[in-house]
Amino acid sequence: MDDPKWRADFDKYSNSQTNEKNGVSEARFRDYGFLKYWFRGVEKFAPWVRKIHFVTSGQAPEWLDTSNPKLNMVSHRDFIPEEFLPTFNSVVIERYMHRIPGLADRFVYFNDDFYIINSITPERFFKNGLPRDIAVFQYNPSWSQWYKRIKNNIRIINRHFDKREVFAKHYDKWFEPSYGSRARLNYLLKPYGKFITLRTPHNAQPYLKSTFEEVWNAAGEELTATSVNRFRKVTDYTPELFRTWQICRGNFEPLNTYADTKMFPLLIKSKQAIRAIYNQSYNLVCINDNVKIPNYNEVMASLSAAFNHILPEKSSFEK
């Protein structure tokens, strides 16, 4: 938000009324100063990470040491087709991730509001070469723009997968005992022949690069057509398309990923988020911003103090 060129492009292409309708606000772009704690968390709690591909529209924080050999600075123009730039739509950026130069065949995707706050192993993300994930259904009320976009994904999934065949082939992965009560819709919907929305912990997500390539081969027309959406629109396809495809293909190892992750919407759970960071209650947390957070400056200061409590030392990624 502090970059004049980015701000000028944002103002040039944006329509405030349309953006508000589609869930676009400055809360999605503002810098609340926590990024350094993301790098500290990776270095302290996941030292096994070999490479970080840091994606921006061309900027770099002043404090970031871009010469760090573990860091690959990636601009949108390095992997997104030129005709779709500039883009301010995260779901467009995410669908092209597999084109990032040097990206490993197995990778973990983090949004900028996902943080590692406790020690975590590679096996948390991959086992037997496959992503760890939870395959459980969720009722989709379609009350929000986001849920409507998820339904766009499911239409593609149902065109390419037969639910009964998937269940028969990968039964143990859909009815893993550790899922507990979260799997209740899996049992209830056994007779139903179509897929519905999958529940997602909304946190760090492991992927196979081949999944993206396969989805693009199957649904490239739809993905290309909606890549013109510089801002979020109800016609979008979200990254859940790739995750759901990966699960339906059986390319995952079952794990109740809710056991060590938590999303905190700061609008209603800022105190819980601060306490969870201080106590390192989870391995992974999502700090979900909102433009209407009351006492915003106070909340951000308390979150910063919590992060600094567990991650006080500079990482090698800081100058």
Task: Annotate each PLM feature.
Residues 1-108, 115-319:
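ER/Golgi luminal nucleotide-sugar-dependent glycosyltransferases, focusing on the catalytic module
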